[in-house]
Amino acid sequence: MTKSIPRIGSRRGGRIASRKNARRIPKGVIHVQASFNNTIVTVTDVTGRVVSWSSAGTCGFRGTRRGTPFAAQTAAANAIRTVIDQGMQRAEVMIKGPGLGRDAALRAIRRSGILLSFVRDVTPMPHNGCRPPKKRRV
């Protein structure tokens, strides 16, 4: 009878959770991009590496419902839920875009319990750059 050879690369004694979740992030930056059609919430650490993200589309909203304030609130809550588990306590918020979800996303971030050091509007404003598209005639 032969002896069984122990497998070196077996996962029996190893950890099952991914290494990404084990990272502790005490401070981060929450980027909210609110367009008229969708709202994207991205959470990064202070160096700029993406930790978590969510959008109204990934939360299950389709079509015109993606641009609603409720969809933005849901997207912000989804993105923040994962980083709170990783130990985030303080954050800075950068809001970009003219969409309806700006205020709703900020409200959801405030309700989450993360201390906000500042909220900054980083919407790009042209200094009379490109010619805008013609007005719609409906």
From Swiss-Prot:
Listed Gene3D superfamilies: Ribosomal protein S11 (3.30.420.80)
Record field: compositional bias (Basic residues): 9-21
Keyword annotations from UniProtKB, A to Z: Chloroplast, Plastid, Ribonucleoprotein, Ribosomal protein, RNA-binding, rRNA-binding
Region (Disordered): 1-21
GO BP of this protein: translation
Main localization of the protein described in the UniProt heading: plastid
SUPFAM superfamilies according to UniProt: Translational machinery components
InterPro entries on file: Ribosomal_uS11, Ribosomal_uS11_bac-type, Ribosomal_uS11_CS, Ribosomal_uS11_sf
Location(s) in or outside the cell: Plastid, Chloroplast
GO cellular component terms given for this protein: chloroplast; ribonucleoprotein complex; ribosome
Any one GO MF annotation of this record: structural constituent of ribosome
NCBIfam families xref list: PRK05309.1, uS11_bact
Assembly mode: Part of the 30S ribosomal subunit.
Similarity-based family: Belongs to the universal ribosomal protein uS11 family.
Protein name: Small ribosomal subunit protein uS11c
Naturally occurring in which organism (per UniProt): Calycanthus floridus var. glaucus (Eastern sweetshrub)
Gene that this sequence comes from: rps11
